[in-house]
Amino acid sequence: ASYQALVRALGEPGDDCPLFDNDFEQLIWMIGSVAGLQAALADVQANMAVGVPFNVAPKAERGMACLDDQKHNRKWWGLPKAIRSSLWTIVPGVTPEGVDPWAELDKARQLGMDEGVRLPSALDALVSYNDSNMQRVRNIIREHANSVQSTASNREYRMPASASSDLLLELSDRLWTENT
């Protein structure tokens, strides 16, 4: 539903970047892309039972290229890089040559922790869980807990900051439940 709202508001992500009128439109673009990523991940975990169209994830990846630069990654806590890198781990053939998506996720996660909005950490943990890399998930959860203690959440963006903590808590609970 969020991805469809993105399409209605700003058009289908793809080859052309929209002309963003303001920061809010950039935020909508990113949140809609995250929704596309989450839909693709959920469908993979459900053995494709949901029926998310195969083109949603690659379109979201191409759409995020509009904001995946140094300026926008700093401004948006590493989220553009995190979204693209996350998609590179699940969509075959979209990773740029010579790029390690996991190393890019590390960079994005650090930006998010530095800026007090840890959505890149949550995305990294989700795709790591999807990749069955439970050690990486546990490390991200620990790193997140330490970061929350050392760097205050960004007051201007409390909702996404809180959502990232909620996602990581849910993953932590899932790991605990699976192992008890």
Name what the model sees in each region.
Residues A60-L126:
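Flexible, glycine-rich surface segments
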Residues P18-N47, R74-I90, V117-V127, D166-E170:
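Amphipathic alpha-helical repeat scaffolds of TPR domains
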Residues A1-D15, G51-G63, T95-W102, R138-R142:
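Helix-turn-helix repeat elements of alpha-solenoid scaffolds
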Residues V44, G93-P96, N133:
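Short helix-capping/linker segments at secondary-structure and domain boundaries
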Residues L105-T180:
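A cross-kingdom marker for long, charged
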Residues M48-P53, Q70-N73:
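Alpha-solenoid helical-repeat scaffolds
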Residues A1-W29, M64-K75, Q110-D114, S150-R158:
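Flexible helix-coil transition and linker loops at the boundaries of alpha-helical arrays
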